[in-house]
Amino acid sequence: VKQGVYYGWKDRDFQKQENQIGTIKLEHDLTDNLTLSNTAVYNKSKNDYLWTNPDDSKGNIYKNGNVWARVNSRVADTDTFTDQLALTGKFNTGRLKHSFNLGAEYSDQETDRTQYIINGDNTTGNKYQNCTPADSISSGWCTSVQNPNRGPWTGSISTEGADRYNIENENTSIYFLDSIEFSPQWILDLGLRWDDYSAKQTMTYGARNSAVLGNSTTPPTAKAGDKVAIKNDSDFINYQVGLVYKPVENGSIYASYATSSNPVGVDGGDGSEGITAAIQNLKPEEVKTYEIGTKWDVLNEKLNLTAAIFRTEKTNTRATTDEGTTQNIGETRVDGIELGVNGNITDKWAVSAGYTYLDSELVDGGYEEITPSTTPKTYRPNSNNGNQVQNVAKNSATLWTTYQVMPQLTFGAGAIAMDKVYANAANTKYVPGYVRYDAMARYNVNKNVD
């Protein structure tokens, strides 16, 4: 396919975004070693788009040389309020020096979203995804993969009749961090956090929903305006511990262990699945990370070198059981290495580079239904167990460097490289690796113009 080929309509497809942020921060020094602060942030955003995504999930390119012009669209209005109250300070217990942060956070996010109906039909055009019969071509839902035939857009787009969603996410948390210095060479970092999280999604049926329309064999099961609400409430505790050893002033070696949680519905406001009836009562997914690393400042502390090895284990992931239900039984694992360089090699030459290696594995994907189906349905351990985790590249690297030729003139160049990533758990579909090159030149005319 030639570079620059576009399968949508340039006079139809669009994206509009708005973002308004207001921040108020108050800070008061209670003593020389004790500070109380409060930061409140209000964010109002809008994301309104409709674009075309060429989709060949049905193999049309090989069947008839066409591609399905699937539509992605969203109209989302999001209001977010966050408030953080923190008490930071220093104190000593005998010979131990403490630097602590005690705080509480509250956040509330509400999103109202819908999507566009195309030609009064549906939101994506999925009934044309096989690019047959011929009306899928004439109506514009399919087009030639090599020479897309796109005249002016003559159809209609409207949110009338589309389903509407209201997503509310609320979180209250309390945390405590303490960095304890035993000596200039040894430092212990401790952290504890409690979260109370709730997610609620209310879906209002639109007139174009298939459950409202029914078909020749299935009568309608809902009416336009009907509402379905699902909710998940969970609370969880996470913690971290890290030990730092500084053999010299400009170098350190550390080991750390940390946990985190991914509750149901945490991504609902992003337009993804978020929360569904099948998972609304499940527990949060749990993540454990083990890491050993080192950091060094060299060349008179102008250049920072870092290296780390780590393991991340994600348990309690949502997977299908041998009874066909969804439960917290899955597990994935990633072993990795990170190397980094950042800073100045000389006064005029700066560099930022990094390399990451990730060995990922689907340890337990639950169960899958045996195909062809049996009656009653029977399940077997997931055949994808042992595969590379989708959307995780084994190798990735970045490089950016600049050189100041003269006080006013600087040149820069760099590259970003990414290994192939699999698009499905079966590791049968993938996006190939790539390298992207960048370059720049900057000239400072004066302190106000460059």
Q: Language-model segments: which ranges?
A:
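Conserved C-terminal beta-signal and adjacent last beta-strands/turns
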Residues: 76, 88, 100, 290, ...
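Transmembrane beta-barrel architecture of outer-membrane proteins
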Residues: 17-21, 78-86, 169-175, 187, ...
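Residues on the lipid-exposed face of transmembrane beta-strands in outer-membrane beta-barrel proteins
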Residues: 22-28, 83-89, 174-180, 241-245, ...
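Membrane-embedded beta-barrel scaffold of Gram-negative outer-membrane proteins
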Residues: 25, 29, 35-41, 45-51, ...
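Outer-membrane beta-barrel and related beta-rich outer-membrane complex signature
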Residues: 1-7, 42, 46-57, 66-68, ...
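Gram-negative outer-membrane beta-barrel transporters
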Residues: 302, 308-313, 328-425
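Structural signature of Gram-negative outer-membrane beta-barrels, strongest in the C-terminal barrel
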Residues: 78, 97-99, 105-109, 165-314, ...
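Acidic/polar loop-and-plug regions of large Gram-negative outer-membrane beta-barrel proteins
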Residues: 1-29, 44-78, 123-171, 316-317
